[in-house]
Amino acid sequence: MEIREGHNKFYINDKQGKQIAEIVFVPTGENLAIIEHTDVDESLKGQGIGKQLVAKVVEKMRREKRKIIPLCPFAKHEFDKTREYDDIRS
Protein backbone atom coordinates (compact mmCIF):
# COMPACT_ATOMS: atom_id res chain seq x y z
CA MET A 1 0.00 0.00 0.00
CA GLU A 2 1.27 3.40 -0.94
CA ILE A 3 1.05 6.34 1.44
CA ARG A 4 0.18 9.44 -0.56
CA GLU A 5 0.43 13.09 0.38
CA GLY A 6 -2.56 15.39 0.03
CA HIS A 7 -3.34 18.88 1.26
CA ASN A 8 -2.35 18.79 4.96
CA LYS A 9 -2.71 15.02 5.13
CA PHE A 10 -1.21 11.67 4.27
CA TYR A 11 -3.55 8.92 3.17
CA ILE A 12 -3.93 5.45 1.68
CA ASN A 13 -6.49 4.45 -0.92
CA ASP A 14 -7.65 0.93 -1.68
CA LYS A 15 -7.52 -0.55 -5.18
CA GLN A 16 -10.87 1.05 -6.02
CA GLY A 17 -9.60 4.50 -5.03
CA LYS A 18 -11.53 4.70 -1.74
CA GLN A 19 -9.60 6.30 1.12
CA ILE A 20 -8.98 3.71 3.83
CA ALA A 21 -6.51 5.52 6.10
CA GLU A 22 -5.49 9.11 6.77
CA ILE A 23 -3.71 11.44 9.13
CA VAL A 24 -4.60 15.13 9.08
CA PHE A 25 -2.29 17.90 10.27
CA VAL A 26 -2.52 21.68 10.24
CA PRO A 27 0.55 23.90 9.93
CA THR A 28 0.22 26.69 12.51
CA GLY A 29 2.35 29.79 12.35
CA GLU A 30 5.87 29.50 11.03
CA ASN A 31 7.17 26.63 13.12
CA LEU A 32 4.32 24.49 14.45
CA ALA A 33 1.92 21.86 13.16
CA ILE A 34 -0.99 20.16 14.90
CA ILE A 35 -1.89 16.53 14.21
CA GLU A 36 -5.68 16.69 14.34
CA HIS A 37 -6.73 13.11 13.72
CA THR A 38 -5.75 9.71 12.46
CA ASP A 39 -8.23 7.26 10.96
CA VAL A 40 -7.51 3.71 9.80
CA ASP A 41 -10.15 1.39 8.35
CA GLU A 42 -11.03 -1.61 10.52
CA SER A 43 -9.66 -3.96 7.83
CA LEU A 44 -6.16 -2.47 8.36
CA LYS A 45 -6.09 -2.34 12.16
CA GLY A 46 -3.08 -3.96 13.80
CA GLN A 47 -0.84 -3.64 10.72
CA GLY A 48 1.11 -0.58 11.86
CA ILE A 49 -0.53 1.74 9.32
CA GLY A 50 -1.26 4.43 11.92
CA LYS A 51 2.37 4.38 13.06
CA GLN A 52 3.53 4.75 9.46
CA LEU A 53 1.22 7.74 8.96
CA VAL A 54 2.53 9.45 12.11
CA ALA A 55 6.10 8.80 10.92
CA LYS A 56 5.32 10.46 7.57
CA VAL A 57 4.09 13.62 9.32
CA VAL A 58 7.17 13.64 11.57
CA GLU A 59 9.45 13.27 8.54
CA LYS A 60 7.72 16.14 6.70
CA MET A 61 7.71 18.46 9.72
CA ARG A 62 11.40 17.79 10.37
CA ARG A 63 12.15 18.83 6.79
CA GLU A 64 10.06 21.98 7.31
CA LYS A 65 11.71 22.61 10.71
CA ARG A 66 8.35 22.58 12.52
CA LYS A 67 7.48 21.22 15.96
CA ILE A 68 4.37 19.07 16.34
CA ILE A 69 1.49 19.27 18.80
CA PRO A 70 -0.14 15.80 18.72
CA LEU A 71 -3.78 16.56 19.63
CA CYS A 72 -5.05 13.32 18.11
CA PRO A 73 -5.15 10.64 20.85
CA PHE A 74 -3.46 8.04 18.62
CA ALA A 75 -0.67 10.43 17.60
CA LYS A 76 -0.23 11.51 21.24
CA HIS A 77 0.15 7.86 22.24
CA GLU A 78 2.77 7.33 19.52
CA PHE A 79 4.69 10.43 20.65
CA ASP A 80 4.50 9.29 24.29
CA LYS A 81 6.08 5.91 23.51
CA THR A 82 8.53 6.90 20.74
CA ARG A 83 11.54 8.67 22.21
CA GLU A 84 12.83 9.50 18.71
CA TYR A 85 9.98 12.03 18.46
CA ASP A 86 10.96 13.97 21.61
CA ASP A 87 12.98 16.52 19.61
CA ILE A 88 10.04 17.49 17.42
CA ARG A 89 7.26 17.52 20.01
CA SER A 90 6.01 20.92 21.13
UniProtKB/Swiss-Prot annotation:
Pfam families: Acetyltransf_CG (PF14542). Residues 2-90 form the N-acetyltransferase domain. GO terms for molecular function: acyltransferase activity, transferring groups other than amino-acyl groups. InterPro entries: Acyl_CoA_acyltransferase, Gcn5-rel_NAT, GNAT_dom, GNAT_YJDJ. This is Uncharacterized protein YjdJ. It comes from Escherichia coli (strain K12). The lineage of its organism: Bacteria, Pseudomonadati, Pseudomonadota, Gammaproteobacteria, Enterobacterales. The gene is yjdJ.
